[in-house]
Amino acid sequence: MTAIRVCSRKFPTFASIFFQNITRNPSIHRISFSNLKPKTLLHPIPPKPFTVFVSRFHDGRPRGPLWRGKKLIGKEALFVILGLKRLKEDDEKLDKFIKTHVFRLLKLDMLAVIGELERQEETALAIKMFEVIQKQEWYQPDVFMYKDLIVSLAKSKRMDEAMALWEKMKKENLFPDSQTYTEVIRGFLRDGCPADAMNVYEDMLKSPDPPEELPFRVLLKGLLPHPLLRNKVKKDFEELFPEKHAYDPPEEIFGRC
């Protein structure tokens, strides 16, 4: 009632019309509950059902971890990566695509392309991309580019290609690091080529960087079927790392049963 009085004082014309309508039609302010059913009062009206539409098409964009850091790669680089992968089975079309699209990339885009190809284990395409980079005016010999490619080839059991890059790297007066030596030695031992593994080992001893422990551990384990070669590596290991121990297998300690 207080609100009605305040309203009537502020809006006298509106209030007079409003009260006249109430007096003429008293039914508008009366609410009848007699016609309502108990079921309606006790149970609320359920909401109308709705349908959710789920898209079942693929929009063609790369999904998931395949394109990690995709936002950091430019559109031109993404286009080149997709084109290289699409044409990798056709050498003629691939060479044409490289001439028309890859060579016009900027430096950062080229580096992004080779990095993404290596991450996706497209080593053959990464090597082609590396050959393009070597022809650029801004290219300088980079041991890390060689390292990534050689390690990828060694893990893929493509030792001939790995050693071809190895020789190119040495011609540019670059030296592998411990991880590169380790993966190449492990690759040759896995392929059953202990002589090639020992050649890489001898090259490691001549490196200007001091050798690390891991390549020796890989050789000591992989040369168990070749005791003469293993004893030589073990002797060098004990001289270079006197505080370390080269553990022999039980049959060498206690003798064969």
Curated annotation (Swiss-Prot):
PROSITE patterns listed in its UniProt record: PPR
InterPro entries cross-referenced by the UniProt entry: Pentatricopeptide_rpt (IPR002885), THA8L-like (IPR044795), TPR-like_helical_dom_sf (IPR011990)
Keyword Chloroplast among UniProt keywords: yes
Repeat positions for PPR: 142-176, 177-211
GO cellular component terms, semicolon-separated: chloroplast
Entry's localization field: Plastid, Chloroplast
Protein keywords: Chloroplast, Plastid, Repeat, RNA-binding, Transit peptide
Transit peptide stretch: 1-55
Signal peptide: none
Outcome (variant: residue 75 to E): Abolished RNA binding
Any single Pfam family the record assigns to this protein: PPR_2
GO MF term list: sequence-specific mRNA binding; single-stranded RNA binding; zinc ion binding
Protein family: Belongs to the PPR family. P subfamily.
Function: Binds weakly to specific single strand RNA (ssRNA).
Name of the featured protein: Protein THYLAKOID ASSEMBLY 8-like, chloroplastic
UniProt source species: Arabidopsis thaliana (Mouse-ear cress)
Name of the gene: THA8L
